[in-house]
Amino acid sequence: MDRRAFLFQSFAATAQALASARHTLAGTSDGPAKHRFPNILMKTHENRQVRFYDDLVKGKHIVLNFMYASCPDSCPLQTANLALVQKILGPRVGQDIFMYSVTLDPTHDTPDVLKEYSARFGIQPGWEFLTGAPDDIDLLRRKVGFVKRDPVLDRDKSQHIGMVLYGNESLDRWAACPALSRAANIAEYVMWMEARTTKPAVGAVEQGTASRPA
């Protein structure tokens, strides 16, 4: 599948999950990028205080998903799969690609809880697990489009953990895919968000030799 076709299908397939974020994330006509992402105060699993937009998103190439430590099945599978993505992307994670997992249970998921959770999966530097005030987390979730129209479903944390949002803030380029997609495919899709003249080779992604844009 070529890049243009994939990007189209990616947005089509995630219409429900990203419905409220489409015009927010899709172009430059809505104003500066900083107004599209809440600049909420958060803490990382290393207990470092950060601002979501200023410190984590502005000018960066990111991968973002939602999770919670007490999730019994889906979250561990998704985290393990994304750990494979991190391995494939290699040293680029933390240098020019940044991975973020935001808890949907901030009351329980303190930095210490998230640190223990990340250690279970051998998470390497460049991937931050984030918590914050419940209202702020809810605002972030909604702003990036993880919303259900049915208010009962929207209150169910398990309804918001199946997708990965990825993009390049400096280019205002965004897409999403299922968190349990093949890890090599996710890594390839992430690299499609770059300003490059050639598409990343699937074989290179498979072998974990992802390179910077040509």
Please place each PLM-identified region on the residue numbering.
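N-terminal secretory signal peptides and thylakoid transit peptides that target proteins
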Residues: M1-T14
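N-proximal helix/coil linker or "cap" segments that precede and/or mark the start of modular domains
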Residues: A15-N39
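A short beta-strand-turn-helix
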Residues: L41-H61
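Short active-site neighborhood of thiol/selenol oxidoreductases, capturing the structured segment around
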Residues: L56-S74, L82
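Conserved helix-turn-beta segment immediately C-terminal to the redox Cys motif
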Residues: T79-Y100
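Thiol-based oxidoreductase modules, predominantly thioredoxin-like and allied folds used
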Residues: D96-D109, G126-D135
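Short, internal strand/loop/helix patches
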Residues: E116-I161
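Thiol-/selenol-based redox modules, centered on thioredoxin-like
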Residues: D154-A214
